[in-house]
Swiss-Prot record:
<comment type="function">
    <text>Potential calcium-dependent cell-adhesion protein. May be involved in the establishment and maintenance of specific neuronal connections in the brain.</text>
</comment>
<feature type="region of interest" description="Disordered">
    <location>
        <begin position="899"/>
        <end position="929"/>
    </location>
</feature>
<feature type="transmembrane region" description="Helical">
    <location>
        <begin position="692"/>
        <end position="712"/>
    </location>
</feature>
<feature type="domain" description="Cadherin 3">
    <location>
        <begin position="243"/>
        <end position="347"/>
    </location>
</feature>
<dbReference type="GO" id="GO:0007399">
    <property type="term" value="P:nervous system development"/>
</dbReference>
<feature type="compositionally biased region" description="Polar residues">
    <location>
        <begin position="807"/>
        <end position="838"/>
    </location>
</feature>
<dbReference type="InterPro" id="IPR013164">
    <property type="entry name" value="Cadherin_N"/>
</dbReference>
<dbReference type="InterPro" id="IPR020894">
    <property type="entry name" value="Cadherin_CS"/>
</dbReference>
<dbReference type="GO" id="GO:0007155">
    <property type="term" value="P:cell adhesion"/>
</dbReference>
<dbReference type="InterPro" id="IPR031904">
    <property type="entry name" value="Cadherin_CBD"/>
</dbReference>
<dbReference type="Pfam" id="PF08266">
    <property type="entry name" value="Cadherin_2"/>
</dbReference>
<dbReference type="Pfam" id="PF00028">
    <property type="entry name" value="Cadherin"/>
</dbReference>
<feature type="signal peptide">
    <location>
        <begin position="1"/>
        <end position="30"/>
    </location>
</feature>
<feature type="compositionally biased region" description="Basic residues">
    <location>
        <begin position="919"/>
        <end position="929"/>
    </location>
</feature>
<dbReference type="InterPro" id="IPR015919">
    <property type="entry name" value="Cadherin-like_sf"/>
</dbReference>
<dbReference type="InterPro" id="IPR002126">
    <property type="entry name" value="Cadherin-like_dom"/>
</dbReference>
<protein>
    <recommendedName>
        <fullName>Protocadherin gamma-B7</fullName>
    </recommendedName>
</protein>
């Protein structure tokens, strides 16, 4: 052979596939010339002008003896025109059988010089076959007990045409019992399935006759029909069931005849004859029935003839399992014929580094290997691949050598080692492959700092805890390995003083357990915050910090302390006077107590333990207010005694007691004779009383002078004097705490001061501002309340008219329900209180009370309850419990009158009570002053 390929053109109206221009490697070989013609073309039909496509002239056709050759010659060349003509009948289904692409290969030969050209004629399918069922009549037996939706596979039709001309769809004649469903075979075909739509009744209709039509996709479409005769039989409930709907098996084409390829198995849950199963082919092509055989009792499939991959690549076999009760089921067996490729590739590792640093950059060589396949051609060409999900890739080197390199960053903490599987696959059909797995260990680098289990820790520790006990534990994890992951703990900061931190807490370096070094006191230290650090042992070391907040919880370790009533300096009990005309509900006095604890432990309740007249008084459970239950009777004693117990809300509760001495009298003068039956004082006591009377007389004179002087000074000054200053130091008394002598040892020490102006005509107390300037020695008023009464008596006698015009309580300062502070709203007059909503509200209210009490103790706030203060007298102050924080003056009354503290304050400031009917003239005088 010699020469070159001529330029080719497309000739004729038929479709011609153009070849490439010239061969790439060998000048004597050309790309094939392609023609496309439909099957069943008439003899003598022109396929194409072969001479023209080969670049030959008309004269060259005969001169160079253009001709074609093939195993079976279906074509010839016209010696005059060079046209390629149809010589014999071309039936695509006969020539190519089931292959979808049908091609006939020819060799065009020319002489002088000798050249051979490859010609391929593609045979296109035409719709020359109608779908056809293997049987014109399909007989089915269906039990009347079959449930709705039960499907029965029908025999599929066969159409040797392909593509659009092949079998397209099925149709079923209209009926009310059955419908038709088309399903796809794995090989791309379709098969019909009869689905029951209405329950069968053999007694009503014992047989059904239907027509099944198969249509192809040609234009116009062709069709084939089959008659379906359905016999309804009595119940056989369970049809056979195959273990699989589709069986797949691969066979090498060189297996000998008689080889068992598969055994299908169906089971039937019925008993007796209905469970005996037989197997048979169903709708199988003749070719498949010649190649395979089926044992009808065992379901074993055997080969009968040698397999030929080039002729048939796949067989689809439908097998029906039927029991003796006429129920059946079907399965498909797909047999793949495998071309012979009997040598798998080999992988040989030549170099391997199994230890890799986790900070290695991409591109580091990990291993070298080569592949080898003893096959030749495409079966010996090998390509390599890696298992998915590994950070490596393969670089091809040369002569079947490869490098395994890193492809991305490594992380030992995420994956400490990799099992890398290298797969080698040849290009055979089907390809053979082999694999080799290598294990790569990642070496740790200290690239992870410790991480605490929580962003912040919060622990609650009850007070009075055991020193040395564990109060908390922090935990940090480090995913690194060895020393890089070993964590130690330490304290690095705190809101406590650094010098005293070690005396409060310590932390275990190994376990992170935090120990208390002392017993905590909630009243002294309620909360503190620590900063702990976790550090690994790497180089360089990495660390992390976390905050630990410790809340010291309260325990009921403080008993209530009674502030009022209190004992006198000599230990004697004071008394309160009650008007004889006091009506039910009248506020007699109030028991005032505090508790240094917080929360429920400071929630106080008041109980009457003993009373000289049980039905005369009532005691507020939460307020401590003593009120009249009924009016004083003629048979009731004017001297009453109440023993009151104050309990907190702790578990178990702690308590304290107080004794109230009440005397019913309209004035202090009536009270003094009641005490005349006391034992006659000794001479020393009488002498002391004489000096006291003289001193009080002098004080009264000085008091009057001080009043006159104060009036004169006020008239001279253009600005108002400091409210509440005492007019005369000798008349100003500074009293210390009236609680128990050791009450200052508690957490809430208080001191209460009050002044008594001499010009006050009403028998009531007035509370002014701080009196720190009062001399400490002037405490006579606190020593004996009886002396105070004797001082006030002349003033009372001097102005009885004013006493008769007593002003009612002032209401202009009282809080509304929405204005009252605290968590429980207004303070009602009942015996129950309202608990705070939560610990925060409780501590907030207690802090307000503590701050106000501290002001009173320091003398920086008025005892009259001025703006922004809660200062109050020892006798009529509120209880510092947590249930209410309203203005206390609305519930505190001066025994012996209907006036409240607000009346006194208003009169002192020159203001008349709202809605009152008091002495307007006197109020006017004060305003003038």
């Amino acid at each position: 052979m010699g020469g070159s390929c001529a330029q080719r053109r497309r000739a004729g109206p038929r479709q011609v596939l153009f070849p490439l221009l010239l061969p790439l490697f060998y000048p004597t070989l050309c790309e094939p010339i392609r023609y496309s013609i439909p099957e069943e073309l008439a003899k003598g039909s022109v396929v194409g002008n072969l001479a023209k496509d080969l670049g030959l002239s008309v004269l060259d056709v005969s001169a160079r003896e253009l001709r074609v050759s093939a195993e079976k010659l279906h074509f010839s060349v016209d010696a005059q025109s060079g046209d390629l003509l149809v010589k014999d009948r071309i039936d695509r289904e006969q020539i190519c059988k089931e292959r979808r692409r049908c091609e006939l290969q020819l060799e065009a030969v020319v002489e002088n010089p000798l050249n051979i050209f490859h010609v391929i004629v593609v045979i296109e399918d035409v719709n020359d076959h109608a779908p056809q069922f293997r049987k014109d009549e399909i007989n089915l037996e269906i039990s009347e007990s079959v449930s709705l939706g039960m499907g029965t596979i029908l025999e599929s039709a066969e159409d040797p045409d392909i593509s659009m001309n092949s079998l397209s769809k099925y149709q079923l004649s209209p009926n009310e019992y059955f419908s038709l469903v088309e399903k796809d075979n794995p090989d791309g075909g379709k098969y019909p399935e009869l689905v029951l739509q209405k329950t069968l009744d053999r007694e009503t209709q014992s047989a059904h006759h239907l027509v099944l039509t198969a249509l192809d996709g040609g234009d116009p479409p062709r069709s084939g029909t089959a008659q379906i005769r359905i016999l309804v039989i009595d119940a056989n409930d369970n049809p056979p069931v195959f273990s699989q709907d589709v069986y797949r098996v691969s066979l090498r084409e060189d297996v000998p005849p008689g080889t068992s390829i598969l055994r299908v198995k169906a089971t039937d849950q019925d008993e007796g004859i209905n469970s005996e199963i037989t197997y048979s082919f169903f709708g199988v092509a003749d070719k498949a029935q010649h190649v395979f055989s089926l044992d009808y009792t065992t379901g074993n499939i055997l080969t009968q003839q040698p397999l030929d991959f080039e002729e048939v690549e796949r067989y689809t076999i439908n097998i029906e399992a039927k029991d003796r009760g006429s129920l059946s089921t079907r399965c498909k067996v797909i047999v793949e014929v495998v071309d012979e490729n009997d040598n798998s590739p080999e992988i040989i590792i030549t170099s391997l580094s199994d230890q890799i640093m986790e900070d290695s950059p991409p591109g580091v060589v990990v291993a070298l290997f080569k592949t080898r396949d003893q096959d030749s051609g495409e079966n010996g060409e090998v390509r390599c691949s890696l298992s998915r999900g590994v950070p490596f890739k393969i670089h091809s080197s040369s002569n079947n050598y490869y490098k395994l390199v890193t492809d991305e960053a490594l992380d030992r903490e995420q994956t400490p080692e990799y099992n890398v599987t290298i797969a080698a696959t040849d290009r055979g059909k089907p390809p053979l492959s082999s694999s080799k797995t290598i294990t790569l260990h990642i070496t740790d680098v200290n690239d992870n700092a410790p991480v605490f289990g929580q962003s912040a820790y919060l622990v609650h520790v009850p007070e009075n805890n055991q020193p040395g006990a564990s109060i908390a534990q922090v935990s940090a994890s480090d995913p690194d390995f060895g020393l890089n992951g070993r964590v130690s703990y330490s304290l690095i900061a705190s809101d406590l003083e650094s010098r005293t931190l070690s005396s409060y807490v310590s932390v275990s370096a190994q376990s992170g357990v935090v120990f208390a070094q002392r017993a905590f006191d909630h009243e002294q230290l309620r909360t503190f915050e620590l900063t702990l650090q976790a550090r690994d042992q790497g180089s360089p070391a990495l660390s992390a910090n976390v905050s630990l907040r410790v809340l010291v919880g309260d325990r009921n370790d403080n008993a209530p302390r009674v502030l009022y009533p209190a004992l006198g300096p000599d230990g004697s009990a004071l008394f309160d006077t009650v008007p004889r005309a006091a009506q039910p509900g009248y506020l007699v006095t109030k028991v005032v107590a505090v508790d240094a604890d917080s929360g429920h432990n400071a929630w106080l309740s008041y109980h009457v333990v003993q009373a000289s007249e049980p039905g005369l008084f009532s005691l507020g459970l939460r307020t401590g207010e003593v009120r009249m239950v009924r009016a004083l009777g003629d048979k009731d004693s004017v001297r009453q005694r109440l023993l009151v117990a104050v309990r907190d809300g702790g578990q178990p509760p702690l308590s304290a007691t107080a004794t109230l001495h009440l005397v019913f009298a309209d004035s202090l003068q009536e009270v003094l004779p009641d005490f005349s039956d006391h034992p006659t004082p000794s001479d020393s006591q009488a002498e002391m009383q004489f000096y006291l009377v003289v001193a009080l007389a002098l004080i009264s004179v000085l008091f009057l002078l001080a009043v006159i002087l104060a009036i004169a000074l006020r008239l001279r000054q253009s600005f108002s004097p400091t409210a509440g200053d005492c007019f005369e130091s000798v008349l100003c008394s500074k009293s210390g705490p009236v609680g128990p002598p050791n009450y200052s040892e508690g957490t809430l020490p208080y001191a209460y001061n009050f002044c008594v102006p001499g010009d006050q005509m009403n028998p009531e107390f007035n509370f002014f501002t701080s009196v720190d300037h009062c001399p400490a020695t002037q405490d006579n008023l606190n020593k004996d309340s009886m002396l105070l009464a004797s001082i006030l008596t002349p003033s009372v006698e001097a102005d009885k008219k004013i006493l008769k015009q007593q002003a009612p309580p002032n209401t202009d300062w009282r809080f509304s329900q929405a204005q009252r502070p605290g968590t429980s709203g207004s303070q009602n007059g009942d015996d129950t209180g309202t608990w705070p909503n939560n610990q925060f509200d409780t501590e907030m209210l207690q802090a307000m009370i503590l701050a106000s009490a501290s002001e009173a103790a320091d003398g920086s706030s008025t005892l009259g309850g001025g703006a922004g203060t809660m200062g109050l007298s020892a006798r009529y102050g509120p209880q510092f419990t947590l249930q209410h924080v309203p203005d206390y003056r609305q519930n505190v009354y001066i025994p012996g009158s209907n006036a409240t503290l607000t009346n006194a304050a208003g009169k002192r400031d020159g203001k008349a009570p709202a809605g009152g009917n008091g002495n307007k003239k006197k109020s006017g005088k004060k305003e003038k002053k």
